[in-house]
Amino acid sequence: KIADQERMILGEIGRLTGVISQYEIDFRNSNKNIQIGKAKDLKLSNDKILNKFILANGFYSGIYNYLPGSGFIDFDNENLIILSSRGVLGYSNDFENQLNFKQIRNNIDKFINIKQFIKHRSFSLKDLLIHENKIYVSYSEEIKDDCWNTSIIMADMNYKSIDFKTLFSADECVHQFKNRDRVFHPHPAGGRIVGIDSDHVVLTTGPYRSRFLAQDEKSVNGKLIK
């Protein structure tokens, strides 16, 4: 009965999450530029000036909170790359004067899409890394129905279109409703990606609140994956 109540509550939350997520997906599919606006600069304690900008569109879905939208940044030479929690990907090399990011077409929705987003706002993309001319994205993968883990997709870096392929996907998963501790949350999922040399990256994986998995040497959860 508790599981049924949880499903009902999550369903109502999912409807709200779905509306926001679909709006962002529609923007991604439009391939429109991501507009930015100038915000008030911030003077730091060392007398340096921090220039602030606001993303005016494209980033709508939050991961921890519903709003504002969440995202990730990285650099590729002179280009600043941005990625939203729902797969809006763009770049700019002159954002002070250009005031927009050009979108990069991608197939992220092949791996995670509205079907997953409506189940909880924290089922999302988790990190972005540009490393050795490759682009890496981690995300919440629904391995089986309502059973999750954190995975990585990768591709050659390209500024027109990117065709991601799976780099890492675990065989095991943590069930959203049927798990040993009877507690689950998609936020403590890990997902951080770091390049450690020219041939390797490291991924963090979280326990999804099944904390005992971090102590289980046979489990990939709560670990660093190379």
Question: How would you label these PLM feature ranges?
Answer:
Residues 6-7, 25:
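Intrinsic disorder/low-complexity segments enriched in polar/small residues
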Residues 149, 214, 218-221:
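A detector of repeated loop/turn-to-beta-strand junctions in beta-rich toroidal repeat architectures
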Residues 223-225:
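Extracytoplasmic, non-cytosolic globular domains
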Residues 14, 18-212:
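Acidic, Gly/Ser/Thr-rich repeat motifs that build Ca2+-stabilized beta-propeller blades
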